[in-house]
């Protein structure tokens, strides 16, 4: 198997490597809604909430004052709420944020004119990051539309590296078939880069980096087998997907962008009522979140196994699946169980001690 970084590898600059929660990345999901219903998706796309633009702008400015300098966007499908993207990008550019990427399925547009209008709005707003295109078997076959997206983005942004690709699979050398199909439409080749330790899609007009995501069978994908693969995850203190403030459409703030992040147990604040400093303090004191960034996910695993050696059906190399399993099943100390599809997206249930714990985070009234 080819060794490649996944979304757990971060190239974000870190001022100091103190083992604590010290976010250096801000990401907004303006809407849960999406034009696709992917079978592996962990986002509750049924929920109608949208982030209010003035409140998001205030939080963006507060994060900048706190010292956070990198900005990204996710969803749902973020391009279904283009006015949010453009307003936040414009203010982010004015403040001097470094843009990461806008994660998109790339097939949200009605026609080429609609696509070009929205992308031109982004360029005028000052967006200088990447368009992170999700291309894998779970998103369905939309090769022609994806090719249109890549070509239009290249022309409008005048950058050969404007697009990056993400794909979810069990292993980095699996699940590449839709990408090979896209490469054919773009007159491109897909090959391994020894320098970057990942695949590249390259054409005369485009240079696209491929990012592998370790598929976590959670939420809608819980029925997929193979999560307990017999190997324990390598400890990384969640430095890649974590050390972030991820704001969902309800205004709730999460400490990571992992597959388990929409669970209520990982809420560390709300932008409608909390400052950035207050959210960071709460995360550090949080009985689960704080421990992950201080001691690692392996410390939570070891604590559970010391209490019950038969607590898990096996070992898993997938960090996000392990986190989701522990939280929904109520195996972790200090937080309740429930949530996700196990709890029909809402609600809580007692943890292993029989306690139903309220961490103290309330949503917008």
For every predicted segment, state its role.
Residues 31, 35, 235, 317-320:
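Residues immediately within or flanking Cys/His clusters that coordinate Zn2+
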Residues 36-40, 44, 77-80, 101-102:
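Active-site-proximal cofactor/substrate-binding loop regions of enzyme domains
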Residues 26, 53-73, 81-192:
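Radical SAM/AdoMet-radical enzyme domain recognition
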Residues 1-27, 230-231:
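N-terminal [4Fe-4S]-dependent radical SAM core
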Residues 258-365:
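Flexible mid-to-C-terminal extensions adjoining Fe-S/redox cofactors in radical SAM and related proteins
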Residues 161-259, 297-317:
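A C-terminal junction/extension of Radical SAM enzymes
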Residues 17-53, 66:
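Canonical Radical SAM [4Fe-4S] cluster-binding loop centered on the CxxxCxxC motif
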Residues 41, 45-48, 245, 263, ...:
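Cys/His-rich zinc-coordinating "finger/knuckle" motifs
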């Amino acid at each position: 198997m080819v060794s490649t970084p996944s979304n757990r590898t971060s190239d974000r600059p870190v001022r100091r490597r103190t083992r604590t929660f010290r976010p250096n990345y801000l990401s907004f999901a303006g809407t849960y809604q999406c034009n696709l219903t992917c079978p592996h998706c962990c986002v509750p796309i049924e929920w109608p909430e949208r982030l209010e633009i003035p409140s998001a702008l205030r939080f963006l400015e507060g994060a900048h004052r706190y010292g956070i300098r990198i900005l990204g966007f996710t969803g749902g499908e973020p391009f279904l709420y283009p006015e949010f993207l453009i307003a936040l990008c414009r203010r982010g550019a004015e403040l001097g944020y470094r843009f990461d990427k806008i994660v998109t399925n790339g097939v949200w547009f009605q026609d080429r004119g609609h696509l070009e209008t929205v992308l031109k709005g982004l360029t005028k707003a000052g967006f200088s990051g990447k368009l992170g295109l999700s291309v894998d078997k779970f998103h369905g076959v939309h090769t022609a539309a994806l090719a249109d997206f890549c070509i239009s983005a290249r022309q409008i942004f005048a950058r050969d590296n404007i697009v990056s690709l993400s794909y979810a699979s069990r292993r980095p050398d699996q699940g590449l078939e839709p990408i090979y199909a896209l490469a054919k439409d773009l007159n491109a080749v897909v090959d391994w880069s020894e320098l970057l330790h990942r695949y590249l899609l390259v054409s005369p007009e485009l240079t696209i980096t491929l990012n592998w995501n370790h598929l976590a069978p959670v939420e809608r994908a819980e029925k997929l087998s193979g999560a307990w693969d017999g190997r324990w995850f390598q400890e990384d203190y969640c430095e890649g997907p974590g050390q972030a403030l991820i704001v969902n459409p309800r205004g709730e703030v999460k400490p990571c962008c992992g597959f388990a992040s929409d669970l209520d147990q990982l809420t560390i604040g709300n932008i409608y009522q909390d400052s950035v400093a207050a959210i960071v303090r709460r995360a550090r004191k949080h009985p689960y979140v704080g421990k992950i960034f201080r001691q690692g996910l392996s410390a939570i695993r070891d604590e559970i196994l010391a209490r019950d050696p038969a607590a898990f059906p096996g070992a898993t190399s997938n960090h996000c699946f392990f986190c989701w399993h522990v939280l929904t099943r109520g195996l972790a100390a200090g937080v309740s169980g429930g949530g996700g599809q196990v709890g029909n997206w809402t609600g809580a249930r007692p943890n292993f001690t029989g306690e139903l714990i309220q961490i103290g985070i309330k949503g917008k009234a």
